[in-house]
């Protein structure tokens, strides 16, 4: 059975499941941000446990085929080295899983933080959708909204 699971989860299948798997979490964050569903499933450890497991599985699969993990550090040497790394599908999956997990974490943080200031959930849908698509810009939008609701600018919380 383990062999069947291993052979089923190819890189393309993992990519599909990771992309589809986060959609319910984002739906809950956007539509039901203050519900128990959001607290239990999205802003808890649950989605990150799943994404972390997928991350470990990708790393394990990479290790089995002899992936050069030391080469990952060359991404800091320049854009040409980063481009070379993105030619490898395993590296793209490691990067993409990381990106999906971080964006979901930021979305959960935005929801929890917006509740402190009683920001309208309809208004919060905009930065959450943008965070899902383009993480840093959604966070930037949220901070602009937060400044108006908090009526102050704080460098730390």
What are these regions (language model features)?
Residues 2-23:
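Hydrophobic transmembrane alpha-helical segments in integral membrane proteins
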Residues 6-11, 79-94:
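Short aromatic-rich membrane-water interface segments that cap or initiate transmembrane helices
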Residues 14, 94-101, 129:
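Hydrophobic alpha-helical transmembrane segments of multi-pass membrane proteins
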Residues 17-37:
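N-terminal signal-anchor/start-transfer transmembrane helix
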Residues 36-56:
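Loop-to-helix transition at the N-terminal end of transmembrane alpha-helices
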Residues 52-72:
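Transmembrane alpha-helix/helix-exit interface in multi-pass inner-membrane proteins
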Residues 67-85:
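Membrane-interface interhelical connector segments
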Residues 125-148:
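Hydrophobic, aromatic-rich membrane-embedded alpha-helical segments
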């Amino acid at each position: 059975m383990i062999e069947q699971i291993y052979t089923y989860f190819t890189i393309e299948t993992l990519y599909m499941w990771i992309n589809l798997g986060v959609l319910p979490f984002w739906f809950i964050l956007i539509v039901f941000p203050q519900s128990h569903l959001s607290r239990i499933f999205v802003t808890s450890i649950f989605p990150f446990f799943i994404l972390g497991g997928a991350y470990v599985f990708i790393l394990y699969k990479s290790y089995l085929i002899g992936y050069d993990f030391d080469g990952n550090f060359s991404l800091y040497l320049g854009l040409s080295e980063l481009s070379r790394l993105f030619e490898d599908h395993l590296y793209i999956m490691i990067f993409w899983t990381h990106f999906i997990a971080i964006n979901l974490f930021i979305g959960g943080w935005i929801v929890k933080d917006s509740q402190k200031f009683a920001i309208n959930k309809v208004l919060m849908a905009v930065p959450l959708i943008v965070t899902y698509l383009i993480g840093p810009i959604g966070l930037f939008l949220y901070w602009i909204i937060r400044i108006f609701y908090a009526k102050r600018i704080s460098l730390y919380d």
